[in-house]
Amino acid sequence: MLDVIRFRTEVVHARRVQNGWRVTSRSLDEQSESNDVFDAILVANGNCATPHIPSVPGLDHFRGRQMHSAWYRYPDTLNARRILIVGSNSSGSDIARELCGGAVRQWRISEEWQRSSENVTVYQSYHDLAKPPKSDYDPRDPASPAWCRRIHVVGPIQHIDEQGALVFSDGARLEDIDLIIWATGFLHNVSFFQAKDEPFCQAPLIVHNQQTSTAATIASADTLHHLDDWMMFYKPDPSLCFIGLPKHVVPFPLVQLQSRVAAHVLLGKIPPLPRVRAQLPISDPERWIIDEYNEAPGPEAWGNFILGREAEFVYTDTLLSLLPRSQPPEWQPFPPWRRELRRKGIEKRRELLGY
């Protein structure tokens, strides 16, 4: 494998040509560019490389500091007393827990921090106040641990006024916030594809319109368009494939399986992937049942690619059924014990880690 891997190399441009894909790459050591032509491209640059900070009206009025959760390391290095965390999924909840002294990992001054964390006031902005965190304690629940009840839950930010105060959807205001931590996810980065090139000028991966915020920039967005039912192959040209787009999954087994399936399709060892019930939500397990007679077009844009536990089981089992039978156990359907362990993930985490 080392013979075909180029380390410290950045892909700066990839475009369709008559005999394949012309890829321009740049060596970060020599600062020199090279051009190669390939039969197919598999984009596997991950879901967590381009942090997303949403556009909030008046954000330039904010007088404190800002950071994305991707840049967070330890709570004692933040040097802030009044902190707002925007987002209530895994990263936001983990950071809020550590800031309030509920940490379980050990670092140089973790015990000292747990004592001094009482001097920090933590606010957490939920997108939907009616919904408690899916996989964490609810700070508003009296039965939650003491560290959790220290978190002050607020709604989504509506705007920031000229005095630098944060105004929320219910009209509440927060002043003198030292630090905003944006736990607002990541964008898919396709900066090496140019919108003016074929076939993207006809069937763009990223579309910006007035109704949705699908495109934060011309090269990155939270939504990709014109993919097949499986969120893998680019429909106008299946020689372009994306690996690892689904979220809320166990990533390594799924990515390994997608890669194997993509290789089989591109090498002609199995037919193109069949249609499924694409009009059903991505998180619905029933969606991932093969529907060979489905002629209805699937949606042109996939939202946030959230698959989820039960749908992941059917998604992977169906993909496995398309591959030639193999002997190694890693290419078998998820065994019952593994499915049960996944279903009890939150319960096991609280039992073993305390949160």
Describe the predicted segments one by one.
Residues 101-206, 269-306, 312:
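A Rossmann-like FAD-binding core segment of flavoenzymes
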Residues 227, 241-355:
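C-terminal, flexible cofactor-proximal segment of oxidoreductases
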Residues 43-105, 109, 120, 153, ...:
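Glycine-rich dinucleotide-binding loop and its adjacent helix/turn
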Residues 11, 35-49, 83-86, 176-186:
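Short hydrophobic core segments
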Residues 1-40:
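Feature captures the FAD/FMN-dependent oxidoreductase FAD-binding
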Residues 30-36, 52-79, 113, 126-154:
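Lumenal/extracellular "mature" regions of secretory-pathway glycan-modifying transferases
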